[in-house]
């Protein structure tokens, strides 16, 4: 039995989950919020009960020390020697990392070198890595990359039709994200279908505030909707998804915004929020749509129709599909979005049952037994994938 902690460090937050392996039993999980901001919040679940403390946590190193202290204080572990490995989520692995990697001074330096590819995420991930290294220097640590799963994409999928030297000199290409989630749900789908992953053509729809679709053939990602950054692809909570690139100088000219300001609009003021005009939360938009709000209805249709189009194109790309998977906050819980996405896919062998679709947050088949293409809901578990990779690489 080993104890593995999975970490997801954001710029002002730290999510954690402690596993007993190989049983994959969750011993505790929690979240530190508002790190470096007044009134930081530390939340930990003990025996299913949430314990919350509001205090000042000036940086990630203090957050890590507090977390480890709480694990012993609540008797979850006797002492720090019980922690056998640490797994860190890292958003961007560039082309360098096509798999998770054991963290050494050299690999940490290499992750720092590709941070310009994910300036909003990687620096925070590295802060988390260094904070744990300081407190637990002798415990093996592993980085698990969001991009790694998509490194199997062929050139025709990842290259942009730009001057080739941009790819050679600057690494400009599609990388894709949510890889750990897409990998988990496609592996789980094969188990639930009782078929070898190598034989399956799967379309995975990770729909949360950020959303991406992946075409997975024989267990390998062959295409995905996000691109060089997580801004590309389908419309999202606050992100635009794909737009005509010529719009950027046009918007700059019309609104007197700088390029950075337009980019901020595309990242934080677009998507469901931009179209609806009032919320990035899908639940609010579904409610407003039911009450007759036309912009809310349009936002829902824009969101669903973009996903619908990716499913069609990826089915064509793989010459068919065996199963469509819905996962993440919206994919697992929104009956309405699944219904809108699936509507009209009967031509490709998708027959789903509205009664079976009336389910939230649990594993389920929502297609009829006779449907040639299965439709599944699989709650994602990125943390358990991180823990598995720590066991695989560190022990």
Swiss-Prot record:
Substrate binds at residue 89. ATP binds at residues 15, 206-210, 281-283, 329-333. The active site is at 146 (proton donor/acceptor). It is an enzyme of class 2 (transferase). InterPro entries: Ac/propionate_kinase, Aliphatic_acid_kin_short-chain, Aliphatic_acid_kinase_CS, ATPase_NBD. Gene3D superfamilies: 3.30.420.40. One of its GO terms (cellular component) is cytoplasm. It is found in: Cytoplasm. Keywords: ATP-binding, Cytoplasm, Kinase, Magnesium, Metal-binding, Nucleotide-binding, Transferase. Its main location: cytoplasm. One of its GO terms (molecular function) is ATP binding. Pathway: Metabolic intermediate biosynthesis; acetyl-CoA biosynthesis; acetyl-CoA from acetate: step 1/2. Mg(2+). Can also accept Mn(2+). Mg(2+) binds at residues 8, 382. Its EC number is 2.7.2.1. It catalyses: acetate + ATP = acetyl phosphate + ADP. GO terms for biological process: acetate metabolic process; acetyl-CoA biosynthetic process. Catalyzes the formation of acetyl phosphate from acetate and ATP. Can also catalyze the reverse reaction. Belongs to the acetokinase family. NCBIfam families: ackA. Homodimer. This is Acetate kinase. It comes from Bacillus velezensis (strain DSM 23117 / BGSC 10A6 / LMG 26770 / FZB42).
């Amino acid at each position: 039995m080993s104890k593995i902690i999975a970490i997801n460090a954001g710029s002002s937050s730290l999510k954690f989950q402690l596993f007993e392996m190989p049983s994959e039993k969750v011993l505790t999980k929690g979240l530190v919020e508002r790190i470096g901001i007044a009134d930081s919040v530390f939340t930990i679940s003990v025996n299913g009960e949430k314990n919350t403390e509001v205090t000042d946590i000036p940086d990630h190193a203090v957050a890590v020390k507090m977390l480890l202290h709480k694990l012993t204080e609540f008797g979850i572990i006797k002492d720090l020697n019980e922690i056998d490995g640490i797994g860190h989520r890292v958003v961007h692995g560039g082309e360098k990392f096509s798999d998770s990697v054991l963290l050494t001074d050299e690999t940490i330096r290499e992750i720092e070198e590709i941070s310009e590819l994910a300036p909003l995420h990687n620096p925070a991930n590295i802060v988390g890595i260094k904070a744990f290294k300081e407190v637990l220097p002798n415990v093996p640590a592993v980085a698990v990359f969001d991009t790694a799963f998509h490194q199997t994409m062929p050139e025709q999928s990842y290259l942009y039709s730009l001057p080739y030297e941009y790819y050679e000199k600057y690494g400009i290409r599609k990388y894709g994200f949510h890889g750990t989630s897409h990998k988990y749900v496609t592996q789980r789908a094969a188990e639930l279908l009782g078929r070898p992953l190598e034989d399956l053509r799967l379309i995975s729809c990770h729909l949360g505030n950020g959303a991406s679709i992946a075409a997975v053939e024989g267990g390998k990602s062959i295409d995905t909707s996000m691109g060089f950054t997580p801004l590309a692809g389908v419309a999202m909570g606050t992100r635009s998804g794909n737009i005509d690139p010529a719009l950027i100088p046009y918007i700059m000219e019309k609104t007197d915004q700088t390029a950075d300001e337009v980019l901020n609009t595309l990242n934080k003021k677009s998507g469901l929020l931009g179209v609806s005009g009032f919320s990035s939360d899908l639940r609010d938009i579904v409610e407003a749509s039911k009450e007759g709000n036309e912009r809310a209805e349009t936002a829902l249709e824009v969101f669903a129709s973009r996903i619908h189009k990716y499913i069609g194109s990826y089915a064509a790309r793989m010459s068919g599909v065996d199963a469509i998977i819905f996962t993440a906050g919206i994919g697992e819980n929104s009956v309405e979005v699944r219904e809108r996405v699936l509507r009209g896919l009967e031509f490709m062998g998708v027959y789903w049952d509205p009664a079976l679709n009336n389910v939230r947050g649990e594993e389920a088949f929502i297609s009829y037994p006779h449907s040639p293409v299965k439709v599944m809901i699989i709650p994602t578990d990125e943390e358990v994938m991180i823990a598995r990779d720590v066991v695989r690489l560190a022990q």
